[in-house]
């Protein structure tokens, strides 16, 4: 059986710019689906009909966060608990020139209106028949989803940053997977690409971090080298702690650790962060080679003030997930794209990832890094963090083993 070959990102961009559909597939560990995607400004009633006839999924229109704000499009819910946190806003219809909003003509008009800078909030009726999606800033380098891939393709093609997408479903009602998606692309003469390749293309074309000078860093856990990095988008500073050298294709121990001031510095018993960090350093020292990327992403990305507010909610009975949601955040707000580029910058291609968190594995693999092994880094619970760890196991899918 011949290996499946996808198109290059350059080929897809050229077709997208001409107003053609592109099929975009994501990681098999994520949604494992493919979508028809087209630039919003290129949509027509005929193309909407094609999407609904041959895609059969939910017709959506990804737009930027800024465009959502301009059009005063609120999110459908304040706390998004869907599996992949699909960022639906309120649904809309264009008011002028449309009737019920459901016809192919009306849906095309509404999608094009979302990509028209002249469209104002009052021009859109709510609810409607089009589902706008709010793409995260920095696109697939922030979130490896079809929503962000759509807006990225529009930007790379020099078009207005808005698109239309729909999931591709087989005639029997099952989700189309890669072999079927390749056949769909062949049947309709379309380009097909992966989000992973789009991420790799952007990482190759763009630099999102600045690298500082390298210094020796002797610690109580071993002798390391330290390199600071500054994130270009917001000035946040991160650290790579490096031990030894390795061959290009050699898998090494890697820990991507989000900063935890309370645990890492003060030894808080409310979490296991400090103990995990120190155990990772000990394991890398024993192995003679490896990397810890220390990310400035306090409280799973919500910041110290909000993390302490979440602690207060936990004292009132909320678990760690519901506390974040109550404060208006996702359960995990971390940005794995920055950590991935730091790893690539220091020459890591393959890794034995030290984590109990399956989302971290998916997040890093989406950025073109190969994880050859998952190395658990479990810490014995104490009376102060047992409920917290149980929530991470039960609600966030962490691989943890301890008695109730």
From Swiss-Prot:
EC number: 4.1.99.12, 3.5.4.25
Cofactor(s) essential for the protein: Mg(2+); Mn(2+); Zn(2+)
GO biological process: riboflavin biosynthetic process
Binding-site positions, Mg(2+) 2: 31, 146
Residues that bind Mg(2+) 1: 31
Domain of life of the organism encoding this protein: Bacteria
Residues covered by region (DHBP synthase): 1-204
Residues involved in Zn(2+) binding: 260, 271, 273
Keywords on record: GTP-binding, Hydrolase, Lyase, Magnesium, Manganese, Metal-binding, Multifunctional enzyme, Nucleotide-binding, Riboflavin biosynthesis, Zinc
Site (Essential for DHBP synthase activity): 129, 167
Entries under HAMAP family matching the protein: RibA (MF_00179), RibB (MF_00180), RibBA (MF_01283)
Record-stated family: In the N-terminal section; belongs to the DHBP synthase family.
UniProt-listed NCBIfam families: PRK00393.1, PRK09311.1, ribA, ribB
Name assigned to this protein: Riboflavin biosynthesis protein RibBA
Origin species: Bacteroides fragilis (strain ATCC 25285 / DSM 2151 / CCUG 4856 / JCM 11019 / LMG 10263 / NCTC 9343 / Onslow / VPI 2553 / EN-2)
Gene designation: ribBA
């Amino acid at each position: 059986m011949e290996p499946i070959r996808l198109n290059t990102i350059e080929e897809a961009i050229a077709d997208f710019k001409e107003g053609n559909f592109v099929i975009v597939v994501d990681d098999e560990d994520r949604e494992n689906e493919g979508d028809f995607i087209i630039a919003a400004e290129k949509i027509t009633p005929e193309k909407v009909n094609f999407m609904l006839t041959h895609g059969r999924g939910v017709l959506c229109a990804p737009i930027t966060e800024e465009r959502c704000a301009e059009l005063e499009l609120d999110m459908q819910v304040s706390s998004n608990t869907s599996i992949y946190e699909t960022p639906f806003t309120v649904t809309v219809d264009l008011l002028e020139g449309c009737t019920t909003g459901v016809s192919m003509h009306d849906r095309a008009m509404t999608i094009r209106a979302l990509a028209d800078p002249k469209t104002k909030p009052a021009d859109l009726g709510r609810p409607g028949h089009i589902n706008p999606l709010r793409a995260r800033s920095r696109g697939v380098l922030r979130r490896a989803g079809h929503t962000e891939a759509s807006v990225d393709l529009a930007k790379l093609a020099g078009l207005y940053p808005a698109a239309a997408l729909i999931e591709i479903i087989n005639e029997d009602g099952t989700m189309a997977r890669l072999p079927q998606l390749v056949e769909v692309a062949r049947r309709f003469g379309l380009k097909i690409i992966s989000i992973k390749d789009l991420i790799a293309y952007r990482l190759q074309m763009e630099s999102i971090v600045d690298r500082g000078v390298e210094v020796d860093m002797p610690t109580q856990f071993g002798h390391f080298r330290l390199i600071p990095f500054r994130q270009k988008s917001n000035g946040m500073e991160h650290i790579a702690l490096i031990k030894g050298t390795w061959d290009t294709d050699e898998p090494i121990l890697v820990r991507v650790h989000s900063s935890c001031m309370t645990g890492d510095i003060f030894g808080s018993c409310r979490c296991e962060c400090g103990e995990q960090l120190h155990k990772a350093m000990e394991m890398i020292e024993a192995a003679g080679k490896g990397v810890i990327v220390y990310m400035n992403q306090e409280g799973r990305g919500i910041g110290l003030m909000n993390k302490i507010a979440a602690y207060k909610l936990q004292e009132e009975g909320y678990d760690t997930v519901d506390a974040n949601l109550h404060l208006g955040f996702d359960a995990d707000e971390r940005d794995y794209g920055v950590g991935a580029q730091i790893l690539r910058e220091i020459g890591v291609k393959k890794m034995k990832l030290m984590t109990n968190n399956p989302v971290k594995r998916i997040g890093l693999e989406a950025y073109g890094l190969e994880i050859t092994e998952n190395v658990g880094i479990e810490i014995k619970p104490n009376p102060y963090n047992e409920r917290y760890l149980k929530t991470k196991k039960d609600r966030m899918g962490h691989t943890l083993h301890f008695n109730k």
